[in-house]
Amino acid sequence: MAGQIALLYEEGQKAPRPLELSKLAKTVAKGEKLQGRVEIVFCSDETVRARNKEYRGLDKVTDVLSFGWEEDDFAGEIFIANPQAKRQAPRWNNTYYNELRRLVVHGMLHLCGHDHMKVGERKTMREKEDLYLKG
């Protein structure tokens, strides 16, 4: 099963234009041949910070975290910290909505196996982000 996307919202959180964000995630899944269901959770800074500490040992807020599960028909989860996205959007010369788009693509690419820890990987991932965002 390819490209099944579920957008979920922690209490008090929301995302503008959810159908467009879901469609964008499906485009990445199709382009990268990702199989299975993906849950994208729009959540608080506190939720992302707790998961970042638990799974990465980093006690700080980040914008997006991806967890690949690869079990049955479930590809993984993406957690997007809404407040962090709003704060950092101006740094990237983005609107809040466009920053969410960037984070959806970024999280999806991580689920597809892409990373940005090394210079070459970072360049490839950025090029793919740009490709899907221009789509």
Label for each model-derived stretch:
Residues 1-101, 111-135:
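An acidic/histidine-cluster motif and surrounding catalytic segment
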